[in-house]
Each structure stands twice: as structure tokens, then as C-alpha cells.
């Protein structure tokens, strides 16, 4: 096996939407960095049975609704 071809695999903190922090191994960022999620399994309609609403973090849902408001969806 070739040496030094694989990315660094280290521990990071993943902050869920409810504020809980989970320690995971990843190639993202550096050791000890924190990745904040916009949506996770506890808040995603695919895993909650559609009971939860999607968060409009970037204004995309609002922009879509405004663009197609006259069609009566």
C-alpha cells in the first residue's frame, strides 16, 4: 500500500440542529473543528414522517413561493 496518499482522518465535533454535539471521525476540517448542520435526521421530513417543516436558511423557499405564487400550488 502506498504511504501518504490518504487524507488525514481525525475527530471533529458535529453540532446538530437541536444544539447537541456529537464527536465523529472525518476528513473534513482539522482536529477539533466544529461542523454546524442546517438539517439533520431529527429535523428532516424524510426521517420524521413529514411532520417537521424545512428551514428556509437561504431564502430559497421564499424565493420559489414568490416566483410561482400565481399558479395556486
UniProtKB/Swiss-Prot annotation:
Classification via InterPro entries: Ribosomal_bL28/bL31-like_sf, Ribosomal_bL31, Ribosomal_bL31_A, Ribosomal_bL31_sf
Keyword tags: Ribonucleoprotein, Ribosomal protein, RNA-binding, rRNA-binding
Stretch forming the signal peptide: none
UniProt keyword annotation of rRNA-binding present: yes
GO biological process: translation
Pfam families attached to this UniProt entry: Ribosomal_L31
Presence of keyword Methyltransferase: no
GO molecular-function term, one example from the UniProt record: structural constituent of ribosome
SUPFAM superfamilies: L28p-like
GO cellular component: ribonucleoprotein complex; ribosome
Domain of life: Bacteria
HAMAP family xref list: Ribosomal_bL31_1
Subunit structure: Part of the 50S ribosomal subunit.
Family: Belongs to the bacterial ribosomal protein bL31 family. Type A subfamily.
Function: Binds the 23S rRNA.
Name of the protein this chain belongs to: Large ribosomal subunit protein bL31
Species for this entry: Ruegeria sp. (strain TM1040) (Silicibacter sp.)
Amino acid at each position: 500500500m502506498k504511504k501518504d496518499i490518504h487524507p488525514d482522518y481525525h475527530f471533529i465535533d458535529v453540532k446538530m440542529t437541536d444544539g447537541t454535539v456529537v464527536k465523529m471521525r472525518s476528513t473534513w476540517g482539522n482536529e477539533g473543528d466544529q461542523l454546524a448542520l442546517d438539517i439533520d435526521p431529527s429535523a428532516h421530513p424524510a426521517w420524521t414522517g413529514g411532520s417537521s417543516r424545512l428551514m428556509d436558511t437561504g431564502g430559497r423557499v421564499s424565493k420559489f413561493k414568490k416566483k410561482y405564487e400565481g399558479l395556486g400550488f
